[in-house]
From Swiss-Prot:
Pfam families: V-set. This is Ig heavy chain V region M167. The lineage of its organism: Eukaryota, Metazoa, Chordata, Craniata, Vertebrata. GO terms for biological process: immunoglobulin mediated immune response. Keywords: Adaptive immunity, Immunity, Immunoglobulin, Signal. Residues 1-19 form the signal peptide. GO terms for molecular function: antigen binding.
Amino acid sequence: MKMWLNWVFLLTLLHGIQCEVKVVESGGGLVQPGGSLRLSCATSGFTFSDFYMEWVRQTPGKRLEWIAASRSKAHDYRTEYSASVKGRFIVSRDTSQSVLYLQMNALRAEDTATYYCTRDADYGNSYFGYFDVWGAGTTVTVSS
């Protein structure tokens, strides 16, 4: 009986490791005003197409700002932007690789921030629920 329980525990543990939900951002760096960067967010452990995915940034003054969203497949991956980045930033997905992107153009000093990829916890059924999965972020510095 004890051996059987050990196997159940091991299989449960391995399943948990295999199914860990996570997002990992990359692509930040130093860029001059007017320049461009593309951020990436590699995701794993969940069905990427089923969820709204968002980009949020935190400025050096520690203010959090939602900036862009890509809705779920059920909502045709429609995109939304904050007024501060609309027309300059483009959010997109590679569903085959489960990667979210943020193309950032015409960068300004005020775009300096740590950028976070987040998953909307509401499973694509309502817009702007709460964000249950966050990455460690990637830092963008816009300076000459």
